[in-house]
Amino acid sequence: MMKSIRFLASALALCLVDAYLVTPPGTPAPGAASACSAWVQASYGLTCDIIHRFYGMTAAEFEEWVSKCPAAQLYPLNYICTDSAKNPSVSQLGDGCTLISGLYYCVQVNYITQSPTWTPPTTTTRSTSSSAGNGVTTPTPTQTGMVSSCNRFYLVVSGDSCYDIAAAQGISLDNFYTWNPAVGSSCGGLWPDYYVCVGVISDGTTTTTTTTTTPTTTSTTTTTAGNGVTTPTPIQTGMVTNCNKFYQVVSGDGCYDIAAAAGIALNDFYTWNPAVGNTCAGLWPDYYVCVGIIGSSGTTTTKTTTTTTSGNGVATPTPTQSGMVSNCKKFYLVVSGDGCYDIAAAAGIALSDFYAWNPAVGDTCAGLWPNYYVCVGI
């Protein structure tokens, strides 16, 4: 009986040493860094290269986080470092990098500065004086390049968008991007659980917040083109001056959905509203967009079936996006909410093949259009 108790205690002790900054939802890959704060589960079609590009890390970083013993200054008391902890399937990256399906791999590490006495991580956020010496304490973590004159901060949570944060804080979106350059001009670099700047010190003395947002009430003005049509505001820059039909964007809208509901072609929507970009990344809620112009009767999309031009005898359904391979034999109709990885996995093909056969979707899946057919087999 005593031997069983000692064995159980030893087993529990071994489990305790595998502590992580953020506990993975399932079984972690052997040798994952104890300072790991984000995880991804290996599944069919997921490759090391996809992980590198999606999470913005180098192959060397990924190898270190998932297969090497953590540095001594990280968590010296909660991890036993041995060579046997390395995971051969990842440590030998190169062209032969493979992942073990079902295991969780580390994709983010939060480092802690070495100190004489180690203190376990807590749920509270560390604060340090800003490097500018302006007397304002800056909470951490923050992304690189944040303005040194910041005096108001916001902790990003999953699901936030740059527009929503700026609107809630009463600042302009342009100022938000200027103060937080790491998030990028399309908000693609906004990281949950990081602090962003939402207010700055004016003239180095007074604490103020610049407010240039549009009031929630909507006013109307006459278009500068003098076409007699009143244009509601706010609108984004560059909208065509001969617009005679408008739509106010709501949170959750997509460019394709707006165009389809208005009975116009997506290309026309992008042309009439250039500020939204050709991937819809610049679509702003609560702003009006153009969905009809003078002299246009709209475009009705009809679905027909035609034979492929390559003469392979396979009927190709329409519509399809440009550039799809001509020797495709198997098709899938995209529905709203689909992702390239999910489509490829369901069809049993590699994600790289899906991108190669459907170049219009791009290598980040930003160009995937609902209600269009894509190739999932050749």
Swiss-Prot record:
Its main location: secreted. The keyword Nucleotide-binding does not apply. It comes from the Eukaryota. SMART domains: LysM. GO terms for molecular function: chitin binding. PROSITE patterns: LYSM. CDD domains: LysM (cd00118). Residues 118-131 have a biased composition (Low complexity). Belongs to the secreted LysM effector family. This is Secreted LysM effector ldpA. It comes from Aspergillus fumigatus (strain ATCC MYA-4609 / CBS 101355 / FGSC A1100 / Af293).
